[in-house]
């Protein structure tokens, strides 16, 4: 059983997936930020690999990626940083990024390196389903890496079922068709999540894009197994770079009873 499957079997609700950008705020902050997120109560982590042209990312995450790239972050550097992270970080960790840098590194080489350090899965929003089916899915399975597809409010029911069947670990429900970090219409979000809930999907559903505080996290968790917080946390780090204090305060507020 994968770490992700184990998590979702143990915790049926209110799963908090926290996003952080590799190499941000400093080049060597990566594992420290991950450690602090785990210690503050994150159930799993989504580690963003910075890329110069991130289609799905809003301005806050784009700015953090630009800073990380300026700091010198590369895929090779990231795998070096992650060599021993499993000695102290036990929650599931998925890498989130884009195909271009992964293909430049070599797709199978990338999967082998990710599996070797203890990564659990990948999110690559610009990997089309047909390419996953014909070429890349088999490589991911070879290295026991979960792969998470994204669905949006505009995705048809038939396509949602296809993406759910192909996904393993969880299904990423994008709250709106805009980029990360925008504001969300809570009534529209509830309607969309109720629709997903009624489909009785194979995978647990986590909601992302616009989840930023206790209110939006609680709303998402009414209809899904959990949610992903990204831009709001990166913004908090940007405003107060004391990683331990900022992380503790941020998660305390989100997870408050």
Task: Name each region found by the language model.
Residues 1-8, 27, 52-61, 70-83, ...:
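Active-site-adjacent beta->alpha loops and helix N-cap segments on the catalytic face
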Residues 11-17, 88-98, 140-150, 198-208:
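Short beta-strand/loop segments at the ligand-binding rim of alpha/beta enzyme cores
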Residues 18, 37, 48, 114, ...:
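Conserved, mostly hydrophobic/aromatic
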Residues 21, 26, 96-103, 151-155, ...:
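Glycine-rich beta-to-alpha transition loops that act as phosphate-gripper elements at the mouths
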Residues 27-37, 155-166, 207, 211-227:
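Catalytic cores of alpha/beta
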Residues 41, 114-121, 140-147, 165-172, ...:
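Glycine-enriched alpha-helix->loop->beta-strand junction motifs that scaffold or abut catalytic
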Residues 42-53, 121-123, 127-130, 171-181, ...:
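Glycine-rich phosphate-binding active-site loops on the catalytic face of alpha/beta enzymes
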Residues 145-182:
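Histidine/lysine/aspartate-rich catalytic loop segments that bind and position anionic ligands
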């Amino acid at each position: 059983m994968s770490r992700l499957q184990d998590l979702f079997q143990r915790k049926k609700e209110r799963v908090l997936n926290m996003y952080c950008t590799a190499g941000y705020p400093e080049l060597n902050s990566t594992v420290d930020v991950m450690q602090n997120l785990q210690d503050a109560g994150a159930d799993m982590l989504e580690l963003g690999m910075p890329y110069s042209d991130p289609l799905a990312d809003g301005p806050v995450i784009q700015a953090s990626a630009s800073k990380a790239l300026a700091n010198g972050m590369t895929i090779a550097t990231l795998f070096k940083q992650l060599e021993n992270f499993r000695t102290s970080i036990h929650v599931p960790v998925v890498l989130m990024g884009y195909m271009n840098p992964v293909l430049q590194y070599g797709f199978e080489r990338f999967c082998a390196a990710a599996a070797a350090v203890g990564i659990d899965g990948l999110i690559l929003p610009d990997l089309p389903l047909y390419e996953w089916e014909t070429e890349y899915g088999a490589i991911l399975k070879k290295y026991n890496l979960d792969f998470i597809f994204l669905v949006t409010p505009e995705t048809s029911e038939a396509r949602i079922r296809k993406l759910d069947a192909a996904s393993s670990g969880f299904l990423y429900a994008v709250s709106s068709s805009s980029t990360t970090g925008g504001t969300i219409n809570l009534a529209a979000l509830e309607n969309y999540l109720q629709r997903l809930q009624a489909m009785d999907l194979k995978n647990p559903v986590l909601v992302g894009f616009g989840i930023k505080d206790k209110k939006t996290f609680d709303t998402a968790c009414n209809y899904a197994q959990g949610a992903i917080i990204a831009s709001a946390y990166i913004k908090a780090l940007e405003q107060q770079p004391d990683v331990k204090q900022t992380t503790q305060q941020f998660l305390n507020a989100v997870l408050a009873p």
